[in-house]
Amino acid sequence: MNKQYQSRRWCWVYAIVCLLLFFPLPTQCAEPITPVLQVQSGKLTGLVLDPGSGLSVFRGIPYAAPPVGDLRWRPPRTPTTWEGVRACNQFSAIPWQRRTGTSKKSEDCLYLNVWTTAAGKEARLPVMVWIHGGGLNKGWGHIGKYDGSAFARQGVVLVSINYRLGPLGYLAHPALSAESDQGVSGNYGFLDQIASLEWVRKNIAAFGGDPDNVTIFGESAGGTSVAVLSVSPRARGLFHRAILQSPWMFGFTSSLAEPNTVALKRSTGSFSGAEELGSRWANKFVAGEGAAALTQLRKMSAQELVDAGSYDARVTVDGWLLPGRPVELFAQGKQADVPMMIGTTRNEGNYFIRYVGSKSRTEFEEKLNRFYGHAGGDVARLYPGDSAQELTGAGCLFCTDSWFLQPSRRMLQGMRHVKSAAYQYMFARPSKSYPKLGAPHAVELAYVFDTLNEKTASAQDRQLAQTMNRCWAQFARTGNPNAAGLPTWPAYTMEQRQYLVLDHEITQGARLRDKVCDVLDRASQDVYNKPPAGK
């Protein structure tokens, strides 16, 4: 019996040891919890990522009430309060969008995330609010490469946000305008962004941030968003610096109700305003345009709305949130008087290589003539080539220049009307994953956030990422990206037009494709400022 008892005892000991080895107790592996912070909606905690530096992250903080049910297609409302302590240790669901994958999607998506090393302290650190890209139709704020840890280690409080996308974020419709106190519709995603900035102003001090030193920055449609916020009277005073990375400003804007210019016909085949476009989309699955149709639309599930018909989200000039096209408002000096960084990548258009080719030289020139009218020939001469390969290259270069570089230059030149300085960059480091594409659209993101794969990135790439992350943080800190140990970055002026070339060897340049941009300036003025003949 004694031997049998001892045998059983050792079996139990062995089993317990195995359990501890393979299934450690939660307290042994869980990340430490931050101190309890108080925000306007209640108390919350986050996770401590690095106890030594105090680096912490707060995930999934609601900055507005869920825009569901009757709140669909309405301006965001104040977030509801909660009892007890909210554990902000999980990212929220991503906004509804047409994409495959396992990421949980929800209409209840108005959440933000905060990275900081000063939670609960009166540190008054500079704040940076990241607005993701994705054509206003896809994306979310907590993609891995947007991790804010590197910025936090630079002494910045980094905030990333989600906002409504696609038809849920940008649908303009006569019935929606009729029920609005301002008589407008569309742009709900931009209103979400403004609500997030209002939340930051009221609450970021609890995370060690300075509500009087807020930088907004974004890439692609996020850069477009920064441009919109920079000229919107609704966002004035909510930020103090702005960074526009590859802002997509080409043919991306429509008026609310009035017939639009050739820019809209290019993508829609009509001169209709945003409301009419929204009505056509809604009429695919709901009859009528009045309040009854709106009731039916609000009863549809988010998935039905996103999947039932393709809605091309766009910026709507509504006269309330957005009084005009951002590029033209910059040119008139009507933007916020805050320091700005504006830049592009060397080969933006190569990202869109599948969409910009032409079967023949004639077809390529016809496309330009349809958009630019009598100026199409001048534009076509900028992009020679006859073979399929040459025409693809011409299309990619045209995309780089007209979609990104020329509008960016217009905004940079518009900064001469205000007191604040502007800085231009051009990211030139080729993509390691797709070297044949050069430095395409969005390639700079992992460098800005310093989130390159440490196992595969070269020492030179890691150094470039660290330098860019420091430049961005320094700009957020002071409004000037120059500091000891950083490359000399001259401000953009109409006389010199200098910019920084971001590559393994960081250099300065001047007058980036100025002659090409001059031609595109003249051509685009004809497009955007004159309605088509007979309309």
Which sequence ranges carry the predicted segments?
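Alpha/beta-hydrolase active-site loop
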Residues: C109, Q182-A205, S270-E276
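Mobile gating loops/cap/lid regions near enzyme active sites that modulate substrate access
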Residues: D50, R354, Q406-K535
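Glycine-rich nucleophile elbow surrounding the catalytic serine of serine-hydrolase chemistry
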Residues: G218-V228
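Alpha/beta-hydrolase-fold catalytic nucleophile elbow
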Residues: N162, F217, S232, I243-S246, ...
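Alpha/beta-hydrolase fold nucleophile elbow
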Residues: F207-E219
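Non-catalytic accessory segments of hydrolases
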Residues: C29-N187, P211, E454, S458-M468, ...
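Substrate-access "cap/lid" subdomains that shape
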Residues: K202, A227-V228, R236, Q245-N369, ...
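Bacterial N-terminal signal peptides
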Residues: V13-P24
